[in-house]
Amino acid sequence: LFPEQLTYIINHAENQYLFIDLSFVELVESLESDLEGVKGYVILTDKDNMPDTKLNNAMCYEDLISGESEEFDWPEFDENTASSLCYTSGTTGNPKGVLYSHRSTILHAWIVSSGNVAKVSSSSCILPVVPMFHVNAWGIPYAGAMFGAKLVFPGPALDGASVYELIDNEKPDLLMGVPTVWLGLLQHLNETNQTLDCVETALVGGSAAPRAMIQEFEEKHDVFLMHGWGMTEMSPLGTATSRTKEMEDM
C-alpha cells in the first residue's frame, strides 16, 4: 500500500491507537501529521529495544501489558458483534473496509481447519509466513488456537535461509505463504542440499504458483502444494485445491 492509502485507512477506520512493528516506525512518523483521530502508538517491542521516536504518546508493548492482570473474564455478547476490520488492496479507488463478526471468524476457522483444507488438530505445528495484516493471516492463527495447535510466527526476515532455519528448529507440518516466499526457500534448499522432511503441506495464496515450483515441492520434498483462493470479503478463504484420490493415483 502507498502511504496515502495507509493514511486513508487509518482515518476511515477511525483508529485511536496504532500497534506498530519496529520496521514501520519511521513510516508512521511521516504520516502522523495527517492522522486525524490517533491518540497514541504501541510499538511492538520491549523497553530495551524501544526506538527514539518522534511519535506522540508512544509506548512499548511490554510496558502496556505489564500492569495488567493475568486473569480475564470473557464477556458475553452477541456472536454477530464485530471482531475485526480488514481493508482491501489492489481495488479501484481507495481501499474498502470489510467488517468481520465473531461468528464469521469462528466459522472461517472451522472451514480452514477441515480435512479438505489445512487439517488442523492439536498435534499440528503451523508456520504461517503471512502477516496478520494480510487478511488476518488467512485466518490460521484463529484456527490454530481453536484446536490447540502449535503456531510458529516468523520475524521480519523472510529469506530462504531464515525460513528454513525456523522449519529446521520447530518442525512444522503445515506452511502458509505467497509464492515468492516458497521460491526463496526452494533456492536455499537447492544451494544447501537440504530437504523438508517434517513438512506435509504448503498452502500458497496471493497469486498462482508456477507449475515447476509445484512439481519441485512434490518430487524433491514430498510436500503437497495446496492453492488457496479468496477475497477480503470472504474472510478470506473461498476455495482450496485439496488432495484427491485421483491426484494421488496419477
Identify what each model region corresponds to:
Residues L1-D63, F77:
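Structural core segment of the AMP-binding/adenylate-forming
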Residues L1-Y8, L22-L27, A149-E170, T180:
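ATP-dependent adenylate-forming carboxylate-activation enzymes
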Residues Q5, E26-S30, S162, G184-L185, ...:
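Phosphate- and divalent-cation-binding pockets in alpha/beta enzyme and binding domains
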Residues L18, A82, T88-T91, I126, ...:
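Conserved S/T- and glycine-rich ATP-binding loop of Class I adenylate-forming
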Residues E68-T81, L85-L127, G139, A149, ...:
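Conserved adenylate-forming
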Residues I106-C125, V135-L174, H188:
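Conserved AMP-binding/adenylation subdomain of ANL enzymes
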Residues M146-A149, P172-G177, L186-M250:
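Gly/Ser/Thr-rich phosphate-binding loop
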